[in-house]
Amino acid sequence: MPARAAAAVGLAFALVLTGCTSPPSAPDPAPDGAPFPVDATADYQLGGAYPPPAGVTLVARDSTEEPLAGAYSICYINGFQTQPGDQWPDDLVLHDGQQRLVDPNWPDENVIDISTAEKRAAAASRIEQAIATCAASGFDAVEFDNLDSYTRSDDHLTLDDAIAFASLLVDRAHELGLSAGQKNTSELGRVGPDTIGFDFAVVEECDQFEECGAYTDVYGGRVIDIEYTDALRRPFVEVCADAATPTITILRDRGLAPQGDPAHHYESC
């Protein structure tokens, strides 16, 4: 499920940190599929698929759902933590003593162990099954959630580990004809597109945390921002009127409830 970066890491620090890392090779080029629609109106449907409001031309859905015909469709994959109910071997998840390490906000999700090249390769082979499902279903792109899991790893993982693993996943997505989206993790800066190969960004609450520029400076109009009704620092109309806000910005309920659910809320800039 969506999880926003918990670490407030400065961009300048991140560039110093990652500048010491030489990638094994340049990222695979973006596929020649449908271009990212910078003028889109988006909906974020991870809580369940439903017919979107009129005018929506970009939709993100879980990998277990079908893409929306006629729209640019993004397939959600929990790339750095286990999905609830998925059984992962002990040696591919981190441990806190004898217990599997969990995300404190999502206690049914374990943090995947990507601390070595061998573990990254083994974990990627499992995630690649979901990527292949997205491609076979007809999605245009994927987003890999919990890229920031290293911040919840009790120092077992580093940003460099996350970069190396993300590079494997993005390369595989590109091989299958899918564009790939960076999820949150503003500290990446230009490492996102230049080293890993991300094609766009999916961001949660960049206005709330006053960091939208960290993404638009890198990806321009290829940024989707989701703000949430329970954590707005100002009225949504003011968010939309701000030139710093990504053009593709929506307001959703925290649980991303489907249309028809009393908790459902959707607005778009």
Which ranges hold each PLM region?
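Glycan-processing catalytic domains of CAZymes
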Residues: T21-C269
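N-terminal export and membrane-targeting signals
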Residues: M1-L11
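Short, well-ordered alpha-helical packing segments
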Residues: A12-A14, V170
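C-terminal motif of bacterial Sec signal peptides marking the signal peptidase cleavage site
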Residues: V16-G19
